[in-house]
Amino acid sequence: MPKAKYEGIYHSIKKRIEAQDYPYQSLLPSENTLIEEYACSRNTVRRALAELVADGYVQTMQGRGVRVIYQPVGKTTFTIGGIETFQETARRNRLRAVTKVTKFETVIVDECFAAKSGFSVGDELWSIERVRYLDGKALILDVNYFLKEFVPGLTPQIAASSIYDYIENTLGMQIITSKRRITVEHATARDEKLLDMGTSGCVAVVVNQTFNAAGLLFEYTQSRHQPDYFCFQDIATRKK
């Protein structure tokens, strides 16, 4: 089955759901209708629908169709779930995105950071600090560490645009898995200086360890979010 075909159908239906062309609790068109509309096989439509089920957009009901269960999540700018880039997040929320690189240097992993990050002692890393702006508000402070061996040629200009786009489309590396830990912490002086904190005295902190197709760690990131614009959202399915 051509991957591009079912992914194109998946993205098309997903956009319609997000635009509420298919509103919450409505039924999607029948399989036969979708097959005719997209000029594809039944298996291709079912693969696209399975992706939407996995993302929490729809729920299948045997013999009764496919119901939309997606609802917009208020003013959230970051939804935990898939591995989503900052630019993708901005597009999903229809917000204007700007990234300002405030630090870009090379560091060597010591024993303390190795224990925390999962990198090996002596590894050479890109150490990057970036402030993420959405519609003019400084809402996210990203502190990134990328293994130079796997991400060569990184520059501040690339960091200000999209590191993941560079990794995937220039270096050709597949980004497969991200392990995340989410906590709420008191805002630091650095948070107060760089983010539009308002009256918030805390930040939502997401720590990521990201792995490539070979299962090798290439990124350790701490993202510090202004809490008024942060949302944790997950999809859980009960298995019997």
Predicted regions located by residue number:
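Beta-hairpin "wing" of winged helix-turn-helix
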Residues: A54-G63, I69
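Conserved hydrophobic residue
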Residues: Y22-P23, V58, A138
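Short, cationic-aromatic polyanion-contact patches
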Residues: A4-Y6, S30, R67-G81
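Short, hydrophobic-biased segments on the C-terminal half of alpha helices
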Residues: L49-A50
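Extreme N-terminal segment that seeds HTH/winged-HTH DNA-binding domains in transcriptional regulators
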Residues: M1-R42
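Short, positionally conserved secondary-structure boundary motifs
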Residues: F78-N93, T102-V107
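C-terminal all-alpha effector/ligand-binding and dimerization domain
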Residues: R96-K240
